[in-house]
A protein has these predicted regions:
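Cys/His-clustered metal-coordination modules, chiefly Zn-binding fingers
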Residues: 197-295
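Interaction interfaces in information-processing and related assembly proteins
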Residues: 1-229
Length: 295
């Protein structure tokens, strides 16, 4: 299935459902960062929820930054997204390897840790960006974001995220968020809770080649869900360039630039988000230093 985000309404418009498949996106990230299986599962979940949240923003100029920092060996994960959504990110320790957890699954919670925080920054063109911080609950990511939505955005939201990894890479990845509107009844919410439990893991549903419409019906228990938006394709895309890297070098102290020129005679910069390398010759560094002197 092609990566896609689809939006639905269930129970006559009283329940909002957003479903996404992100298998290709997560596999691309795995290759770029050479991620271990557990790092793939963790980073894939964060990329998926960030793609959903990024797409919820209104303007093409809006930007989302999501940082997740726990006390586990994975360290900090950071993802940025726009409303397209184009996402990119990095993992502090991409090669972390842990034994399977008690359920025989990749130990995402152990890799991230259960002490730490989620930091969400939304730059939506106001004077100051919106910042929401929420402590981690389990490190499993979906539970942590359900807590974030409840505490920071005052939305009771069911969140499911999953990445299925085998020896060849990512078999399936995706997620969904379900948000009741104020007029949703307790009976409808209860039916959804039961349906979510019965439906099982999102990664398993995608691996069975279920469509996003079928998944939306399955997790809500409503056969009459209404599709309201489709043809949204999340992508892993980095906008780095040599010009951006040069801007970064230009912010360095003059003495640091002089040291690079005198000791190394060149510089190599690597983009955190896509691992692309940029080479700067001695002459280019001298030009940057000269511009610095004139500023």
């Amino acid at each position: 299935m092609q990566d896609k985000i689809m939006k639905f309404l269930a129970y006559d418009g009283k329940i909002s459902v957003v479903c996404t498949s992100t298998t290709e996106l997560v596999e691309e990230a795995r290759k770029i960062h050479d991620l271990s299986p557990v790092a793939t599962a963790a980073f894939g979940r964060l990329l998926t929820i960030s793609a959903i949240m990024g797409n919820e923003m209104k303007s093409a100029k809006d930007k989302l930054t999501v940082q997740m920092k726990g006390n586990g060996p994975l360290g900090t994960m950071l993802v940025t997204a726009d409303n397209f959504p184009r996402v990119k990110g990095y993992v502090a320790n991409p090669v972390v390897d842990l034994p399977l957890n008690d359920m025989g699954k990749l130990d995402v919670g152990g890799a991230i840790g259960n002490a730490g925080f989620i930091n969400v920054i939304k730059d939506i063109g106001l004077k100051e960006p919106y910042v929401g911080i929420c402590p981690l609950i389990s490190g499993e990511i979906a539970e942590d974001f359900a807590e974030y939505f409840a505490k920071s955005e005052q939305k009771n939201t069911a969140v499911a995220l999953g990445v299925l990894v085998d020896k060849d890479g990512v078999k399936s990845a995706g997620g969904y968020i379900i948000t009741p509107m104020p007029d949703a009844t307790d009976e409808e919410i209860s039916k959804i809770e039961q349906s979510i439990f019965k439906a099982g893991a999102i990664s398993k549903m995608l691996d069975k080649n279920m469509t996003l419409l079928e998944i939306a019906k399955s997790v809500t228990g409503d056969e009459n869900v209404k599709l309201i938006e489709e043809n949204i394709t999340p992508e892993y895309e980095c906008d780095c360039s040599k010009e951006h890297m040069e801007d970064g070098l230009a912010t360095l102290d003059k003495d640091v630039l002089k040291e690079m020129i005198e000791e190394d005679g060149k510089a190599e910069l690597v983009c955190h988000f896509c691992n692309k390398k940029y080479e700067f010759s001695k002459e280019e560094l001298e030009d940057i230093l000269e511009k610095n002197k004139n500023n």
